């Protein structure tokens, strides 16, 4: 995914995960967008 900013964290933008982040990456939070989510560790 593309890098993105979420609550001051640098995260990864996932286009295919609309409401949750993929498991197995150790993400601790996210920001939802109209399409996709920004997931950060």
UniProtKB/Swiss-Prot annotation:
Cited function: Neurotoxin. Causes paralysis in crabs.
Species lineage: Eukaryota, Metazoa, Cnidaria, Anthozoa, Hexacorallia
Which keywords annotate this record? Disulfide bond, Ion channel impairing toxin, Nematocyst, Neurotoxin, Secreted, Toxin
Compartment annotation = Secreted; Nematocyst
GO MF terms listed in the record are:
ion channel inhibitor activity; signaling receptor inhibitor activity; toxin activity
What protein name applies here? U-actitoxin-Bcs2a
Q: Which cysteines are joined by disulfide bonds?
A: 4-38, 6-31, 21-39
**InterPro entries xrefs:** BDS_K_chnl_tox, Myo_ane_neurotoxin_sf
Instruction: Please tell me where this protein is predominantly located.
Output: secreted
Q: What highest taxon heads this organism's lineage? A: Eukaryota
Q: What family classification does the UniProt entry report for this protein? A: Belongs to the sea anemone type 3 (BDS) potassium channel toxin family.
